[in-house]
Amino acid sequence: MRNIGIIINKEKDKENKILNLVILKVKEYLNPDEIKVIDQFYKGDYKDLMSLDLLIVLGGDGTLLGVARKFSTVIDTPILGINIGNLGFLVTAEISELDEALYRIKVGDYKVEERMLLSCTIEGVTCSDERALNDIVVARGTLSRMAQYEVFINDELYATFKGDGVIISTPVGSTAYSFSAGGPLIMPNLQIVSIVPICPHTPNSRPMIIDGNNKVRVKPLINESDVFVTIDGQKALKLEKHNEVLIKKAKEFFRIISFDNKSYFKVLRKKLFKIE
């Protein structure tokens, strides 16, 4: 691999000790022509990133979600996620496994898996086209009253309910907010979407699984409530009356490196269920 990029969450490595260690190990195992350290809030020319053969992301799940949201539309470089955060459910390896991970990449003992992304557009809002690796949430504000939501699938009304909101989740996001709201766990390689009401006040409002090629439209009936759309829990936009949120599978994918010894169910047991 000739060109390697590194993105690090500086809040978790203020003295650059981890960054310097990773640079040293990358040189030792992969011997690249160039190592480019990229700020996680990068605002430069994305063309500079298109030549990367590998992008190493140092942080936790939040850092990885931010990278997916910001860079997925401009580069399709395979990503090696190294956890230096807390949960680290989405990452490829822990920082303690750095040597093993880089060695596996060196000898070609790895896979590049594609993860589905969601595209979110808000009708009536300029430049609202966003990407989400986990979920898109349409929900009331903290101090708002319960709101009413209409959910359409391919322009056909699916449900109308009152509640706190609705989560539109990818398979990757099924272990996040959707899981806490009673949604199902979904294997991350599938191309499906879950629709999960949040605290619905209607007994028959239940989670729904649909094929990823379907389009979802959420129409909040805004009266006295403030309603927001939140992308991966990181970016929020307030909706105005008559705004509708259009959600569909993005044409891009999030490409992440995986190893055979890190099965989905093994990670589930360890990270989510706390079973070794």
Curated annotation (Swiss-Prot):
Predominant cellular place of this UniProt entry's protein: cytoplasm
InterPro entries per UniProt: ATP-NAD_kinase_N, ATP-NAD_kinase_PpnK-typ_C, NAD/diacylglycerol_kinase_sf, NADK
GO cellular component: cytoplasm
Single biological process term from Gene Ontology: NAD metabolic process
Binding positions (NAD(+)): 61-62, 134-135, 145, 162, 164, 172, 175-180, 234
Cofactor(s), by name: a divalent metal cation
Keywords, sorted A to Z: ATP-binding, Cytoplasm, Kinase, NAD, NADP, Nucleotide-binding, Transferase
Subcellular location: Cytoplasm
Record has DNA damage as a keyword: no
Coiled-coil boundaries: none
Family, as annotated: Belongs to the NAD kinase family.
Function: Involved in the regulation of the intracellular balance of NAD and NADP, and is a key enzyme in the biosynthesis of NADP. Catalyzes specifically the phosphorylation on 2'-hydroxyl of the adenosine moiety of NAD to yield NADP.
Protein name: NAD kinase
